[in-house]
């Protein structure tokens, strides 16, 4: 699988680790956010281990679906986040969950399809 476009849904601790791991790789990484959070991330970027990163922030559905969607939200946010990100999964998109617990993969499989999931944690 060639990763040309990656979207990250949830830029907390796990999402930030994924973002940092993708820096310097030959792919375009976008952070999915909306409203005030999107505005703040666009304006301020993020700091990871003392290094500042500017971010490519996109509202869900504003750009074509990525090849990889990384889901890194809190469990209680998952259903709403998937509603927001429904347009982020095209026919060739695979989804990798960085979420803890057992139920998140069940929710993702039901909403997106088990055949499109990469099990990670």
Locate predicted features:
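NAD(P)+-binding Rossmann beta1-loop-alpha1 motif at the extreme N-terminus of oxidoreductases
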Residues: 1-49
